[in-house]
Amino acid sequence: MPLSDTQVFTALFVALITGILSLRLGTQLYK
């Protein structure tokens, strides 16, 4: 079952948002 372009794009977008949120949360906790 191959992934469609939409599913791949959605997965990358979600991973990007999650990374940004975790990075901001980490910097706030570090301060």
Swiss-Prot record:
Swiss-Prot/TrEMBL keywords: Chloroplast, Membrane, Photosynthesis, Photosystem I, Plastid, Thylakoid, Transmembrane, Transmembrane helix
GO CC annotations, alphabetized: chloroplast thylakoid membrane; photosystem I
Membrane topology type: Single-pass membrane protein
Biological process, per Gene Ontology: photosynthesis
Keyword check for Thylakoid: yes
Disulfide bonds: none
InterPro entries, A to Z: PSI_PsaM, PSI_PsaM_sf
A Pfam family that the UniProt record links to this protein: PsaM
Domain of life: Eukaryota
Membrane spanning residue stretches: 10-27
UniProt-annotated location(s): Plastid, Chloroplast thylakoid membrane
Cited NCBIfam families: PS_I_psaM (TIGR03053)
Family: Belongs to the PsaM family.
Official protein name in the record: Photosystem I reaction center subunit XII
Recorded name of the encoding gene: psaM
